[in-house]
């Protein structure tokens, strides 16, 4: 019947769907275009159109694939998508089933960074009101960075130069790679478990965005924000920045700058102490001069305005007040002198001369140990060399000649067995002191096998 040649809509749609499924060029398709009409319902799937100036392609990305892309797609964003072409039978249209997506042009990391920054800023992790004030005179500083990089050397050198008395505790950690963020968070937690750390420096030297990425990871940014110990973030060079810089209490342009922010310079303290001493002496001198002028005025008043009895009373009162003034002044001077002596003692205690002397002693001891080790090693090498020379001399063919043996040559070639010689051959035997030429007239082989 002619009606048998008519197909149902479902049948023809299934046929077209099968064609797409068996076509190898449709199984993995790479598409570049602009996202438009983006929708994401409660299911988590993405429905959108990929278009260029000539055409558009309906597309869908299921929730499992959406969770892996690492950024938030938006209308107008240019993307690179990998997936397959298939048929949505209910709507009777072909569409693109996206399996992987990444930004086209601007790197995915930059987009991910800006989106995470916006999210954390809305949560208040960068708020100035939350930031803690750095201590003026820390005694212990913790450093979270690589133990082999230039950053840790710069920090240690700067702190030792500025305030040798400060103890620096380094928490070595990897600063890039898959495990870097976890290690940084763990070390921040360890530091906060202690109760003797005054300030913490986290950071590393310069690098690319990928190399600095650990300090942009959300767990690191939150750990810095939640830290009870004040945090100085010093990631990269002056032009670099990381999200940990925004959540930290203070951001430093470089590791060296972080060390300068963490501790004061003892030389500045000496200058401030000298300035305060000068101001104290000046104030004391002015106070004394004012009191002396007041006393002189009082004496003149008594002389000009009172009889003898009144004068005596006034003189007694004057003596009384003069004594009180003297005592008060003495107490003030004693108090200021005590404060000055205490500050002066602290300055001498923290002076780097002691540390320098100790380091010189350590250098001398290490040099002596090194000299001793080098001499012993040289002696051992000489003895080993002598033993090797003796062994070589023992194995030398010349040593065999000295013991009475001879070496036989035939036509310049060394003869090792009697089987190599025939009657009538001419041979040369080398012995101690010379050689002899010989002619083979007979030979006898050893049949014992020795």
Curated annotation (Swiss-Prot):
Keywords: Cytoplasm, Exonuclease, Hydrolase, Nuclease. The keyword Nuclease applies. Its EC number is 3.1.11.6. The keyword Cytoplasm applies. It is found in: Cytoplasm. GO terms for biological process: DNA catabolic process. Bidirectionally degrades single-stranded DNA into large acid-insoluble oligonucleotides, which are then degraded further into small acid-soluble oligonucleotides. Heterooligomer composed of large and small subunits. This is Exodeoxyribonuclease 7 large subunit. It comes from Listeria innocua serovar 6a (strain ATCC BAA-680 / CLIP 11262).
């Amino acid at each position: 019947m002619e009606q048998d040649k008519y197909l149902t809509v479902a049948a023809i749609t299934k046929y077209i769907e099968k064609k797409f499924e068996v076509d190898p060029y449709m199984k993995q398709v790479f598409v570049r275009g602009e996202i438009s009409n983006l929708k994401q319902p409660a299911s988590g799937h993405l429905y959108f159109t990929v278009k260029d100036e000539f055409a558009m392609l309906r597309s869908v990305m299921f929730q499992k694939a959406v969770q892996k892309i690492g950024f938030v797609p938006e209308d107008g964003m240019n993307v690179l998508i990998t997936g397959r072409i298939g048929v949505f039978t209910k709507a009777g249209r072909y569409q693109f089933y996206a399996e992987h997506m990444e930004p086209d042009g601007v790197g995915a990391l930059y987009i991910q960074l800006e989106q995470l920054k916006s999210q954390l800023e809305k949560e208040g992790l960068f708020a100035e009101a939350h930031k803690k004030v750095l201590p003026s005179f820390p005694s212990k500083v913790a450093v979270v960075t690589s133990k082999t990089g230039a950053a840790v050397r710069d920090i240690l050198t700067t702190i030792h130069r500025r305030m040798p008395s400060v103890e620096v505790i380094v928490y070595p950690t990897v600063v890039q790679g898959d495990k870097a963020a976890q290690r940084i968070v763990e070390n921040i937690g360890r530091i906060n478990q202690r109760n003797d750390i005054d300030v913490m420096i986290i950071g590393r030297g310069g690098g690319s965005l990928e190399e600095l990425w650990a300090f942009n990871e959300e767990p690191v940014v939150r750990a810095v924000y939640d830290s009870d110990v004040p945090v100085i973030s010093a990631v990269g060079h002056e032009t670099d920045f990381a999200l940990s810089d925004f959540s930290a209490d203070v951001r430093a342009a470089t590791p060296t700058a972080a060390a300068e922010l963490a501790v004061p310079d003892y030389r500045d303290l000496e200058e401030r102490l000298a300035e305060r001493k000068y101001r104290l002496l000046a104030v004391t001198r002015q106070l004394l001069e004012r009191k002396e002028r007041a006393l002189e005025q009082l004496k003149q008043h008594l002389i000009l305005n009172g009889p003898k009895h009144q004068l005596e009373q006034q003189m007694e009162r004057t003596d009384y007040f003069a004594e009180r003034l003297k005592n008060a002044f003495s107490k003030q001077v004693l108090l200021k002198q005590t404060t000055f002596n205490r500050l002066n003692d602290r300055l001498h205690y923290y002076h780097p001369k002691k540390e320098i002397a100790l380091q010189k002693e350590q250098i001398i001891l290490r040099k002596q140990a090194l000299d001793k080790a080098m001499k012993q090693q040289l002696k051992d090498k000489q003895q080993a060399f002598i033993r090797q020379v003796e062994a070589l001399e023992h194995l030398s063919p010349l040593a065999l000649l000295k013991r009475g043996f001879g070496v036989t040559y035939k036509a310049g070639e060394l003869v090792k067995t009697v089987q190599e010689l025939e009657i009538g051959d001419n041979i040369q035997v080398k012995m101690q002191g010379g050689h002899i030429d010989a002619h083979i007239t007979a030979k006898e082989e050893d049949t014992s096998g020795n």
